[in-house]
């Protein structure tokens, strides 16, 4: 059973680590990609009739792949986290208890609710607006492209806040999962007993002997 507990806990922590790492690296990639592409200011032959910013389309195409991979990783990691938490509670007596357990469950619920909102509400709507924007831009329909780009940008702020919430919740959950249960109270230093002189008795001498001394 101790080995099973260790395996379950290891998978739980590993899934949280991959989940958090995926979120952080996705944010870093986006923060690097868009300014770099803006500085390059490419002109895309496939969008020759579009008079808007081509760098935004080029960066968006690359970022869309990155965020799609991140979404898949998040979903897989969330499933592993939930399964290992349930398996640990049922078979390995790894039930979250006390304030620490309440905080872990709260962080997990926040992460799962935010992830569900991201995957099943925001992502489909943003994907539809993004692809319509690209199609309109490729056809040279600037008004339609601008309209869907604006709709995408409106959701983009919400998506950023949602991903930040997931990152914070997963980070807290990971910290609580690996933090030691508690620190033992320090043991006071023991002073070795003072040796008694030879011939000294630890017993109180009788009163009669005291009077004779």
Region locations from a protein language model:
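Interfacial loop at the N-terminal end of multi-pass membrane proteins
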Residues: 2-13, 17-95, 128-149
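Alpha-helical transmembrane segments and their helix-start/interface "positive-inside/aromatic belt" motifs
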Residues: 3-21, 101-111, 170-176
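Individual transmembrane alpha-helices with interfacial aromatic-anchor signatures
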Residues: 66, 146-167
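Cytoplasmic juxtamembrane regions at transmembrane-helix boundaries
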Residues: 81-106, 177-203
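Hydrophobic alpha-helical transmembrane segments in integral membrane proteins
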Residues: 120-129
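A hydrophobic membrane-anchoring alpha-helix module
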Residues: 165-172, 179-183
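Short, charged juxtamembrane terminal tails flanking transmembrane helices
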Residues: 191, 208-213
């Amino acid at each position: 059973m101790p080995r099973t507990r260790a395996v379950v806990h290891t998978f739980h922590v590993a899934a949280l680590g991959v989940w958090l790492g995926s979120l952080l690296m996705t944010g870093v990639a986006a923060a690097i990609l868009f300014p770099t592409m803006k500085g390059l200011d490419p002109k895309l032959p496939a969008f020759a009739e579009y008079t808007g910013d081509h760098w935004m389309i080029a960066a968006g195409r690359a970022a869309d792949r990155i965020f799609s991979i991140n979404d898949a990783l998040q979903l897989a990691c969330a499933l592993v986290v939930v399964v290992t938490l349930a398996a640990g509670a049922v078979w390995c007596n790894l039930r979250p208890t006390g304030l620490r357990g309440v905080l872990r469950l709260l962080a997990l619920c926040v992460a799962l609710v935010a992830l569900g909102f991201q995957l099943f509400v925001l992502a489909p709507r943003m994907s539809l607006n993004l692809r319509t924007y690209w199609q309109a831009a490729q056809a040279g329909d600037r008004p339609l492209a601008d309209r869907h780009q604006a709709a995408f940008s409106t959701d983009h702020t919400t998506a950023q806040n949602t991903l930040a919430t997931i990152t914070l919740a997963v980070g807290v959950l990971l910290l609580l999962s690996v933090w030691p249960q508690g620190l033992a109270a320090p043991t006071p230093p023991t002073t070795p007993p003072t040796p008694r002189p030879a011939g000294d008795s630890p017993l109180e001498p009788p009163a009669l002997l005291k009077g004779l001394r």
